[in-house]
Amino acid sequence: MSYQLELSFSPVNELINSLHTFLCKSWHKRIDLGPAWTQNVHASLSPEFADQLEQTGIDLEWKLLHLLAYVSPNKNSVEDYLLWMRKLTLGELFAVLSPYVQTFPEDFGAVRDRQHRMLSEWNEVYFKHIDPGIVTALRAEAEEKTGWGEFEAYEKAAALTNGFCFEPVNGLEKLVLIPHYHFQPGNIFYSYGSLTICQYASRIEPHSEEEDEPSLHLYRLLRSLSEKSRLRILHFLRSEPRTFIEVVRHLGISKGITHDHIFNLRCAGLLNVHVVGETVSTYSLRVERIQQIEQGLFDYLGMNPSLLSIPVNEMVEPSNEC
């Protein structure tokens, strides 16, 4: 049993992702852009638009918006997509979405109109002003990774998403991976029956003026190992996948603190996250990421570990001095 894997990207995806990031308040302290990004964007909004976004939740309507962007034939530019979205009749709207979903909001036409106005204004006040290099880099990421032909769909998806293992369950026919920038280090995924769409963290980082600045990817990895409880989680998962509740019981601490520890390990790529539909079923140890820790640190230091080997008989005896 397997599924088809597709790599995709359009500017519309990042338009929606950037707004998703702004709306998802629980992630504002977790994103690589930091809380300052949210504050700066909020300061640029009109009071009316800020109030509208304050009342907008991440719900079924939002899930359908991600799907609509994927099925649209006019998504090479944000302007083309918004024009297509506005001109869709209600019948056409149902026609393009009904192969994947059977549940729709009441008064779907009004929902579409509201989403169109929201995306249009977000594009005007924020998205059209972002560094164009972000979109260019995301498009290049999708094109480059499409060429990873030597991997099976399951393994390729796990590698690109930093450990998300989309299990090949009955009914899943296609997994679409879309690189994103704003919501890093998180992934966003939705299941639509035979189709699953996952926006994954591209690991594209802002330019740093400091030559010795470690990558966020490396820093997150090393920092994730700074808590004893996180090391205990890795040890607990070393032999077989475990559910979240099993991890909580093993640690003997609260669900909230356990969730934070798992979040840090997951974003560092140290855990496999086994996904069934839209549910995380279990976690397991991502051994290949453990093996990359030493090499990642040596790469940052600009050192070749093969040139640093010291024969045992040449090692200095430890001193007894304090």
Map each language-model feature to its residues:
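N-terminal, charged low-complexity regulatory/assembly segments
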Residues: 1-170, 174
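C-terminal regulatory or interaction extensions
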Residues: 144-220
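Alpha-helical residues within the helix-turn-helix
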Residues: 248-249, 266-267
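Helix-turn-helix DNA-binding motif, specifically the short coil turn and the N-cap/start of the second
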Residues: 254
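Beta-hairpin "wing" of winged helix-turn-helix
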Residues: 271-277
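Conserved segment of winged-helix/HTH DNA-binding domains
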Residues: 281-312
